């Protein structure tokens, strides 16, 4: 037997899991490969994927028959990350300064947000406060990963005015009637 197997592949989509990895098997890629005798093995040029593979990847399915005849064909594996970041926030207290203003950063509000791939940005719905915000304020931390998945969570920001007023007095001369 000198006849090569006929290799037939199919394209697949792989969604990464919570750890940022995904995999496929040769039988998933094989779409009905045949041989005039018997197929002995099916192997893939790549079967494991991670965050660095997001997008399209060309792989090869290699089929070998029982007599050592080999052929291969390509398949396109589309790797996608559809898992939103896990957003974890913490409440903060902001003391206004002498000008009546105060601010916070997304990093201060973030309390350990994670993503199966990588976090690209953290933004706050409100980061600057003034005297009109004294008391409790609910804000949102929005986290976006490198693949465009977004989620957000709220945090309570307590704004306080702890600067004592400055009292300015003037001297007065009082005349008394005798």
Residue ranges and their predicted role:
Residues 1-178:
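Proline-threonine-serine-rich low-complexity tracts
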């Amino acid at each position: 037997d000198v006849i090569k197997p006929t290799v037939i592949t199919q394209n697949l989509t792989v969604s990464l899991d919570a750890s940022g990895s995904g995999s496929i098997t040769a039988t998933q890629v094989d779409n009905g490969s045949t041989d005039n005798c018997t197929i002995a093995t099916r192997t893939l040029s790549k079967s494991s994927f991670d965050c660095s593979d997001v997008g399209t990847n060309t792989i090869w399915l290699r089929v070998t028959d029982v007599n050592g005849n080999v052929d291969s064909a390509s398949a396109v594996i589309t790797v996608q990350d559809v898992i939103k970041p896990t957003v974890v926030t913490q409440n903060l207290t902001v003391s206004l300064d002498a000008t009546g203003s105060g601010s916070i950063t997304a990093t201060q509000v973030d309390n350990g947000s994670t993503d199966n791939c990588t976090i690209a940005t953290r933004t706050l719905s409100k980061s600057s406060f003034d005297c009109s915000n004294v008391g409790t304020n609910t804000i949102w931390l929005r986290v976006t990963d490198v693949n465009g998945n977004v989620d957000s969570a709220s945090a309570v920001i307590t704004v306080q005015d702890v600067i004592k007023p400055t009292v300015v007095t003037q001297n007065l001369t009082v005349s008394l009637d005798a």
